């Protein structure tokens, strides 16, 4: 149901997630030992609570499926390019691309790290799909300008930017997860606005974000900064969804964390849905749906 809270801990959600993983999704491939920032998994005494590469954040494929189903319009038969096109300025791993391809969408993801792009392309080659996945290596601030002709226009944007320096993905100076807070905010807003310039009018934009803490322990208000970056372009906030995460190891960490510094255990992310146009123009002729006949492995789980 299209409610404002999604609980990812339910059996139904986890089955759907397992179904996608059964296709062979390995979004963590391509990330080396620097691909997560261990400080977030330490308490104030310096004791490591969880510190393995498997803890690098992986985008939820079930969330991809849901957002593509809810917010990607049906193909326009009058257009030369009939498959809907998804733009992702902060691609990271392979999940958003491969789920898009499996659902008959064409995906364009911008990713700074060459090794991650190569791993993603191999994943797509192994798994395939009805749609086409294209990962563009390089700094999104540049590749979003250099890659496309003026005729290119995406039907949907789905992205998940770095949460400040919560996870550090590389030591590349162009990697915004390496930047100081002020520089990060400016670079992030710049990339978002360059991506929004490639959106069709009257389309949706979904950004999965969460507030993170600065070096002093204060929340950085990343949600509000994301809203501001989009609304400057004229892309207005239309829906907000709270994505409730699985408790997992948080149950073990939160008591000690709260006792030490009164920090609440974070159990959710924010899925911000923007509309790039006039809501009055929305059509009621349906939205994109996945052909499960072409996804037998997944269909067994659903």
Spans of model-derived segments:
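Class I S-adenosyl-L-methionine-dependent methyltransferase catalytic core
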Residues: 1-302
